[in-house]
């Protein structure tokens, strides 16, 4: 097993030097030898996240990415969550800009929530951003339980993406078209096969029934005509719909919010035409031919939406923060068990969308990560069992390396000796740890693997059911190329195989 560790630490190093020089007369406690010790300690997150963006105050909720051709960058709007929201007014739309999905600049507040508890947009819900003829549009959800309709679709416009004007005279109300006034949200706009703008909205039929997508069309992004509805999957509410065409295929990315440990994941459907795409959701859904019902990531990646600069298409979602009295409670607080949900909001995570020759999708690392994580750090063996010259042998074999920094890129290759070998990567582990955390590459059968999150050790709970990944094909040569990126407490792991479906199609699994 060959391991390379890269780190981003220039800012941290600069801060340390400045602090050390602030007072020549001050002598603090002696520095602990973190590099030379292996016992457990509970680390804390920095105030802001640099790679998987999180504001210094509050957290990121449902992103709305958009490629701004006028400025040549991505604008990623999102719902700003605070720890202590007002009872009726919350989730103003904030934003960041990025050219590459790995480095961000804050835009601050883009669109405020309403001025009082009785305005329709006292609270804001997610939507989308579009540009036409020099005017930027934000279509968003106005949410207020004090109003006749709890949720309606609203819009705001801007000539420069800086000064926004809410259109107080325009709304789309679900009951006017036979839909629920309580659930009518998450508008998303795209150009369909008829070269008109189409908008889909997540909702329910008025009077009850399974959830559905309401559909509208427009020639000018101003006046909208209702053109019907299409199904969701049985009784599963599919939030944050996002429709796009990539090559010869149409896709609908959605977040399945059914309250069960096997649900609440970002998934996709695919078809050759837009009409066929809508039909994929009929009874007996036509899943993508990827073997895992279109699942793109774990339950720790939600509300994913995409944007393309014409070369690369990226998907942004949020990784939930975890609460608890200590690091061990936080690490397993993932909404395990049917009916439980992870915390809402967290850090902004970006992946590159990989399209395979059969049209199926997987997620890969953002290319700019390679240049961002560019300082090599020594990987020193601190303790081991059953380890010799890069080979681990026997049950319970492991190798423990030195501590990592705040942000890291860990790259290594594993070759297993047979089709049933099981291996993993552990974190928050010391030589004295009675419980620690491992992402396990688990054999599900002879030819399939799945990434599991486990609390191991003599006091560990074992498999954490609501944080596992999805099935993927075992590499034919049993060689796994693995890249892990960390930013504070956020971790993303990519598994690649050089013996994939066809040459070059080696991105097989992503796990946040």
Label the predicted regions.
Residues 1-8:
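Bacterial N-terminal signal peptides that target proteins for export
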Residues 12-15:
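Alpha-helical transmembrane segments
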Residues 17-20:
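C-terminal motif of bacterial Sec signal peptides marking the signal peptidase cleavage site
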Residues 23-512:
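Carbohydrate-active catalytic/glycan-binding domains of CAZyme proteins
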